C-alpha cells in the first residue's frame, strides 16, 4: 500500500444448501463516503451441491483515505451474489490501514509510530452480569476514547 494506491483482497465464503450445483457470480464493489465507486472485482464460480467454497476477489483503490483513530475513514463494501435471476446483497464498513509491531519502534500504524494507551477491563458489567450487551461495551469504549484518549483494551477472563 502506498499513498497512490491500495490493493484489496476480499474472500467471500459461499454455501450451497441445494441439491444441485450453482454457477454464482460474486461482485464486490467499494464506495467512498460520498458514494463514489472506488473499487470493483467480479468473479464466477460453481458451488457444488451441499458444500461451501471460497471466492477471492482482488483489486486496487487509487489514492486511498487511510483509517486511523484520529481519522476513522470507512469505506462501504457491497457484495452481490447472483444465481440465475436471483441475487443477494451484503454490506459492511471497512477501513484501510497498515499496522505492524517493531521490536525497537513499537506499534506502527500507517507507517507512523503510535503509542498504545489502554486499559484492562473485567469481563462483566457489574449489576448487568457477564452477558454484557453490545451497547454497554460501545458506551464504555466511546467514553474511554473521549475522556482518556485510550485506543486499546484487554479483557480479563
PLM segments and residue spans:
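Secreted/periplasmic carbohydrate-active enzymes, especially glycoside hydrolases
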Residues: 1-156
Amino acid at each position: 500500500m502506498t499513498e497512490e494506491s491500495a490493493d484489496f483482497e476480499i474472500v467471500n465464503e459461499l454455501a450451497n444448501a441445494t441439491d444441485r450445483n450453482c454457477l454464482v457470480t460474486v461482485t464486490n464493489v467499494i464506495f467512498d463516503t460520498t458514494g463514489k465507486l472506488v473499487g470493483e472485482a467480479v468473479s464466477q464460480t460453481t458451488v457444488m451441491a451441499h458444500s461451501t467454497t471460497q471466492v477471492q476477489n482482488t483489486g486496487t483503490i487509487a489514492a486511498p483515505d487511510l483509517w486511523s483513530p484520529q481519522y476513522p475513514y470507512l469505506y462501504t463494501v457491497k457484495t452481490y451474489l447472483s444465481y440465475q435471476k436471483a441475487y443477494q446483497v451484503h454490506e459492511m464498513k471497512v477501513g484501510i490501514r497498515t499496522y505492524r509491531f517493531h521490536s525497537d519502534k513499537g506499534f506502527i500504524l500507517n507507517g507512523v509510530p503510535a503509542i498504545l494507551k489502554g486499559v484492562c477491563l473485567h469481563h462483566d458489567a457489574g449489576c448487568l452480569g457477564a452477558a454484557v450487551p453490545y451497547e454497554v461495551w460501545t458506551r464504555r469504549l466511546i467514553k474511554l476514547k473521549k475522556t482518556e484518549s485510550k485506543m486499546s483494551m484487554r479483557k480479563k477472563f
